[in-house]
Amino acid sequence: MHSKNLCLSLTSLCLLAAADTALAEDWQYSLEAGMANAPRYSGSDERMTAPVLGGRIISPWGVFLDTDTGLGWGYEGNALSFSAYVGASDSRKDKNESMHAGSKRLKGMGEIKSRPQLGVSAAYNLGGVIIGATLEHAIEEDKHKETGKAFTHLELSLGTNLYEGRYGSVDAAINSHFGDRNYLQTWYGVTADQATRSRFKEYEARAGNISNGMNLSWSVPINEHTQFSTLLDVQYLADEAGKSPIVEQRLQASVLGELQYTF
């Protein structure tokens, strides 16, 4: 399983603490390890549990290297934060593999390969409410292939801190995801050729709303350098995605438990 989706959700909530893109006085390093339980792919009613491993390096000048987003630069002001990065897009296989999204139920749909991806993310603190937006564009892998076209994804979010005290910190956010036509067609559409090779009927997906949902995280400090975080992510697939024949369940829930060590 690629840890990116869940870890990005956790990172977006951590914007409240301004930990990921702030200009540090010194180099910052962090390591993360945990377990995640999530649907095998977006729309699946099958579930899988897999380890989640990651790391992050942030320089005093805002340059960062992150296993979830990639290589980039970030800035943190009093209320506004911004980052731009180059990384790798998500992938999906048409067979069961313990460390990758996908399912044998998708046999014949072909593999969606990871490819270079450009991203920008911004957040504004409006009196304790974090308004966030993340735009990602995956580069074309093969324009003649059903799963290789360039696509664009946008996430809009509103987050806030619900509790901070002796039992740690609880943060929550609501979000909506949007995609262009190529994104929806790549992840939820079924072409005529795919229909002949798989068990799904042909389906042409259009640009629009992918899903709407919420994240809830609880972070508990263990000592000066270590904290344990849990995340619940719930998404409801909207019409263009939810009506796809590959979608077996529109309500998608994922959970993550992660230990983070910063030094």
Tell me what each language-model feature is.
Residues 43-48, 95-100, 143-150, 183-191, ...:
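Outer-membrane beta-barrel translocator domains and adjoining extracellular loop/strand segments
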Residues 35-39, 59-61, 86-92, 126-128, ...:
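Transmembrane beta-strands of outer-membrane beta-barrel pores
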Residues 40-44, 66, 71, 107-111, ...:
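Outer-membrane beta-barrel domain signature
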Residues 18-19:
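N-terminal signal peptide c-region/cleavage motif recognized by signal peptidases
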Residues 61-65, 80, 128-131, 166-170, ...:
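Repeated loop/turn-to-beta-strand initiation elements of outer-membrane beta-barrel proteins
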Residues 33-37, 53-59, 69-75, 118-124, ...:
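Residues on the lipid-exposed face of transmembrane beta-strands in outer-membrane beta-barrel proteins
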Residues 27, 37, 47-53, 57, ...:
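Residues that define the transmembrane beta-barrel architecture of outer-membrane proteins
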